[in-house]
Amino acid sequence: MLLDAGAQYPAIGVTTFGSSRHHSAGDVTDREVALGINPFADGMGAFKLNPSSHDLASGQTAFTSQAPGYAAAALGHHHHPGHVSSYSSAAFNSTRDFLFRNRGFGEAASAQHSLFASAAGGFPGPHGPHADTTGHLIFPGLHEQAASHASPNVVNGQMRLGFSGDMYGRPDQYGQVTSPRSEHYASSQLHGYGPMNMNMAAHHGAGAFFRYMRQPIKQELICKWIEPEQLANPKKSCNKTFSTMHELVTHVTVEHVGGPEQSNHICVWEECPREGKPFKAKYKLINHIRVHTGEKPFPCPFPGCGKVFARSENLKIHKRTHTGEKPFKCEFEGCDRRFANSSDRKKHMHVHTSDKPYLCKMCDKSYTHPSSLRKHMKVHEASSQGSQPSPAASSGYESSTPPTIVSPSAENQSTSSLSPSSSAVHHTSNHSTLSSNFNEWYV
């Protein structure tokens, strides 16, 4: 596709596609110079962003040729270098800065963050065509960068938007002009083409784009099934490793659990708490094995929930929390309580029958609901902690405090607790001892 951008971007060195323009140095008018039009650009030009003349080395100007025929005939190399430089710098830079600021072009991290190839390619110069062809790559960051380039992320102050397959770069013999300003514009302008920014910085190397893609965590799932013939000491488990849960479950079901010909449904997984107690049906054994493998094949279908379950019955009960369904009504006359599952209704029925099946093992109290028993057990936990030295006193808090810091009133305090003022003093006095004590508490 040919794009005529000359009328729209006259101030950034963009020429019209399709027709060649041949000028001599004498044809350059003051108006063209002030507008930043490059009279020596060929018809197949593209975006050319050059730094100002004061940023370039001697012998270079703010405008260079883009066509092969004028590779050595830039304005700075021949007739009127001083004339062109004096008129071009201020007008070109101010217009370019205003254009890119108002068109919302963002800034990128480096020159490699854009679609445009770096300064390399088959651009013919006075010494013949350049041998390197990495400039023709649409995404050179995904391929190996040429080791012969001294600075592959520098585009020598130029950025060209051409055709796919015709991404030309500047040859190395003209690649000696670099400056912070040229690198800045080469990396930041035209960042608006964000959906195609697939190249990363040159120092990341080839394929660095893929570091932003989360790599799946490789896991090894080990089969700990012990065959009946290997039950003799020392017991030897299967120990086959698998990379996916599906492979492990298929292996256990087919090779260990077996088909309908198996009459004994016994779990012989390593350290299984059932200790060889058989199941009445095969499906119950398969459901039990999920405790060992961690398989949970029943996800909640409601969006945003994300919970998964090992048993379909548990999923069915869980879905009632989303739907609000409570199919189990209290059977006691006059009670209209309803429940999502039968176990909750059974616990509730003890309120009406005055049964207290939940006994405290530390005293003679009993309760109708397990939640009441859990609250009661906290009383025993608090009393047991009160009869013994508290963690703060037994972990060396007072022993780690210098005697000059502790007041006489603080020394007479109970060892079971510390006041906020004294604890604050201890906290500021010895940080290393305090951190070690916390590690001891929560291990």
From Swiss-Prot:
* One term under GO cellular component: cytoplasm
Q: Where exactly are the transmembrane stretches of this chain?
A: none
An MF annotation (GO) of this entry: RNA polymerase II cis-regulatory region sequence-specific DNA binding
Compositionally biased intervals (Polar residues): 397-413
Disordered as annotated region, ranges? 371-433
Record's InterPro entries? GLI-like, Znf-C2H2_ZIC1-5/GLI1-3-like, Znf_C2H2_sf, Znf_C2H2_type, Znf_ZIC
Q: Where in this protein does the record put region Negatively regulates transcriptional activity?
A: 408-443
What is the UniProt domain comment for this protein?
Answer: The C2H2-type 3, 4 and 5 zinc finger domains are necessary for transcription activation. Removal of the C-terminal regulatory domain increases activity.
Q: What is the similarity comment for this entry?
A: Belongs to the GLI C2H2-type zinc-finger protein family.
Name of the molecule in the record = Zinc finger protein ZIC 1
Naturally occurring in which organism (per UniProt): Xenopus laevis (African clawed frog)
